[in-house]
């Protein structure tokens, strides 16, 4: 999987002043600290309508109407599969309540499977870079995967912000349910790194089949200042205060040598979570290499195939 971003702590005094004083606003702090959108690695093009329907009025984006779109990957996307696999990837754009149009992707890895992962990726990648990983993961754990780019990432319009992050996953949730008819009891929310923030927020408001938190953070301030012991009013991404409201089963995965989001964050989230299942603490793993350890796939398979209902 592509790297999910650089270190987020260990700032100099000058950097801290820039983060928290220009201006001292949580959303601006969050954007400076957490969002690193790469140069887009893909485009989404709407295909020409057949001659018989060419005179019909254009479809409104985000309306839930099926639209024929094609995915075009750049060389930076590092595509690893054949055209047959690429044909199993559907892309479209969906409007959020805050006015952004999100790039969305549905990967049919396992058509007969019960579960679909709603995957919120890390802070320094886009769908083009993640597409190959999604196909490999979904095939191995027998799940389809739905993902989306945050506002300001990939082909998604708007700018990255904490408020947009929550609106983005809300739109993705409704797109998955409306466009593909996937019901909540068949949706597994999967968040990685910064993607755990919208995942916890959504899971605290909607019940689903399960939640997977991969390298989660307690809050933005606790990443920048590891000695922080409580949530302040100006903190960003306060997942630690929301996790207690999650009523679905939660699997937490964290590397013990994570150099970006300390292992203590995963432990604290696990201890605060009312429906946590047996976690996966990957001994020696950092922030960007958990997927390389055999126990990663083993634990996911065990959780999805044996600990969740599959009838």
UniProtKB/Swiss-Prot annotation:
Its main location: membrane. Residues 48-67 are annotated as: Disordered. The active site is at 193 (charge relay system), 258 (charge relay system), 287 (charge relay system). InterPro entries: AB_hydrolase_fold, Hydrolase_4. It is an enzyme of class 3 (hydrolase). It is a lipid-anchor. Hydrolyzes fatty acids from S-acylated cysteine residues in proteins. Has depalmitoylating activity towards NRAS. Belongs to the AB hydrolase superfamily. ABHD17 family. This is Alpha/beta hydrolase domain-containing protein 17C. It comes from Xenopus laevis (African clawed frog).
